[in-house]
Amino acid sequence: MKRILILIHVLFCGYICPLLAEDTGAVRYQDSILKVADTLPATLVRLTYLRDMAYKHQYAPYNMTFSTRLYEEARRQKNAFYENMGAYYLAACYDKKHDPDSLSYWVDVLKDFVSQVGTYDYYLEQKAAISRALASKRQIEKAVYVAKETLEESKLRHSNNGMIAAYNSLGCAYGVSSRPNEALDAFLEAYRNFSPQTKTSLKVDILSRIAQVYGNGGKDSLKLPYLHEMDMTLQTVISKEPETRKNWSNFEIDCEVKYILHYMNQKNFTVAHEHIEKVKKLLEPHVDPVFWLNVQLIQLQYYAKTDEYDKSIALIDEVTPTVLNNYVSTFATLIN
């Protein structure tokens, strides 16, 4: 029991393993993509290829490299559309890092492109991300201000994606500051404003957060429809674009973890175990360590509820060396 408590203490303090250690295989793969780009004519052909690579690799260690290369190539070719796309993907990289200063830089870049690309969506979506980054640093008042400012600007510019992103960020700021009712109101308002133009990533994120708030409040009957819709939305986009599946892995894991918690709370351990086995298959090297962490914790909870203490000890023996010897960072906050 003491070993279990030590591991859980370490995990909840945020010490996690660098599952994304850049091995030689990853470097070779990355280099091979860039070499192909170099062989293409320095025209729209090369830009389109780099855009596709950035789109398909929105996860570490490739997202920063391919986004940067797209942005730099677009600048060389003086192509505003692709330069804007590169800046958008770079902003997304810093969104994942919860880095408000770097995000702000790229948001300013995106704002300058609005008149050239003819849409406010890219700029406003990433401006909303600044609010989430601020909330992760516990700068709540500033986070709420940025989210509300982005929301008003999105309404003024008729930007659906900007509006959904702003409601999402506003809800996150309220959630971090222990205001679940206000958070839920913001997320539900985002949901009510879904349209055919709303990006799938924004839809999935909102559905996840609504399910989370209802789940935390013990309102399973209200949670399940949003969780099922999240699952269905994920499977639809993955079936349409299977080459982008790794972009969605973190969301898939999040969805499965929510199912596991639901069925454990219902004491349906057979179905909960089925989802545990399913989620373990998703733990590939590109997965964000936070989600890896959540899966380890959920398995420990499952074994505790089913009195499988031997399996708890075996799991601890398996993951403790990785956690203790290879952690590289401490997250200020987990996924809301």
Residues covered by each model-derived region:
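A "functional boundary" signal
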Residues: L20-N336
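Sec-dependent N-terminal signal peptides
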Residues: I4-Y15
